[in-house]
């Protein structure tokens, strides 16, 4: 009779819920064996569910594949809302039918998984471009226009150049066919890939700024208006990376000028 350890090793090789190996092992009354069977079945079901989720997130890409297009770039940005730091956009071209386990809208990915999935995108992408527009430009042109500039910069770095753009809720004035998708980072794998690249890139930048400008908790809040950030603003004033067109930074800077 096989040991439970041997059965566990055998079950790792089973990839289908209908496998005859399960039927055979289910005759074994040992509780340890039944426990391993249940565990393996749950793992297989989780893999099937994940594959279905990823498949559903390729629906926009698959429509474009039917038209003979394969160089499809997903575009997304991070950092529209913060009081400090740049807006960062990423453009990512994934290989045809590429599925990266765990890839999703970056807001839905556990923080501890960010770097792992970012690395998987880096490893598998055909091309990646990153656009970074700083707070000074944001203050000059407004955040919406700055976001478009960041996206255009990211796209310009792609090689090969894309045949079609899938963009998260935005239209760009570029001579490339494009589709604007509401909640694109949750509905397109290409956009989700851009989302995690932009997110990790910006988070790392804000960690560096935290070293330069201590007291605002940038490493944790990424420039968003948390209690610690606002406390730092009140005590220390605005830094060179703060967006002076955003409240409450604007009022704080104006108040200091008037006094």
UniProtKB/Swiss-Prot annotation:
Per its Swiss-Prot or TrEMBL entry, what cofactor is needed?
Mn(2+); Mg(2+)
Kindly state which keywords UniProt assigns to this record, in alphabetical order: Cytoplasm, Endonuclease, Hydrolase, Manganese, Metal-binding, Nuclease
An annotated GO cellular component of this protein is: cytoplasm
Q: Is Manganese there in the keyword field? A: yes
Q: Which reaction does it catalyse?
A: Endonucleolytic cleavage to 5'-phosphomonoester
Q: Where does the RNase H type-2 domain start and stop, copy by copy? A: 70-258
List the PROSITE patterns hit by this protein, alphabetically. RNASE_H_2
Q: Which residues bind a divalent metal cation?
A: 76-77, 168
Chief subcellular location equals cytoplasm
UniProt EC number: 3.1.26.4
- What Gene Ontology terms describe what this protein does at the molecular function level? manganese ion binding; RNA binding; RNA-DNA hybrid ribonuclease activity
According to its UniProt record, where is this protein located?
A: Cytoplasm
EC class (word): hydrolase
What SUPFAM superfamilies does the record point to?
Ribonuclease H-like
| InterPro entries for the chain | RNase_HII, RNase_HII/HIII, RNase_HII/HIII_dom, RNaseH-like_sf, RNaseH_sf
Instruction: Give the matching NCBIfam families.
Output: PRK00015.1-1, PRK00015.1-3
What this protein is reported to do is described as: Endonuclease that specifically degrades the RNA of RNA-DNA hybrids.
| Protein name per Swiss-Prot or TrEMBL | Ribonuclease HII
Mind giving the lineage of the organism this protein is from?
Answer: Bacteria, Bacillati, Bacillota, Bacilli, Lactobacillales
């Amino acid at each position: 009779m096989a040991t439970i350890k041997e059965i566990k090793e055998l079950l790792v090789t089973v990839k289908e819920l209908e496998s005859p190996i399960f039927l055979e092992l289910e005759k074994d009354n040992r509780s340890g064996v039944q426990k391993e069977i249940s565990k393996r079945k749950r793992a297989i079901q989780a893999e099937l569910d994940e594959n279905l989720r990823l498949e559903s997130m390729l629906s926009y890409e698959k429509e474009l594949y039917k038209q003979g297009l394969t160089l499809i770039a997903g575009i997304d940005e991070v950092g529209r809302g913060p009081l400090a730091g740049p807006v960062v956009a990423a453009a990512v071209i994934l290989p045809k039918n590429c599925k990266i386990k765990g890839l999703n809208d970056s807001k839905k990915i556990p923080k501890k998984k960010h770097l792992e999935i970012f690395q998987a995108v880096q490893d598998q992408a055909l091309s990646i471009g990153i656009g970074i527009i700083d707070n000074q430009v944001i203050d000059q042109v407004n955040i919406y226009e700055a976001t478009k500039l960041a996206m255009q910069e990211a796209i310009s770095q792609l090689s090969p150049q894309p045949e079609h753009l899938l963009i998260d809720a935005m239209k760009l004035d570029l001579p490339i066919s494009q589709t604007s998708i509401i909640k694109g980072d949750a509905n397109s794998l290409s956009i989700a890939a851009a989302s995690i690249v932009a997110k990790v890139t910006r988070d790392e930048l804000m960690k560096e700024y935290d070293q330069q400008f201590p007291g605002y908790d940038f490493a944790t809040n990424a420039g968003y208006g948390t209690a610690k950030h606002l406390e730092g603003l009140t005590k220390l004033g605005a830094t060179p990376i703060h967006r002076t067109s955003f409240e409450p930074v604007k009022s704080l800077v104006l108040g200091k000028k008037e006094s």
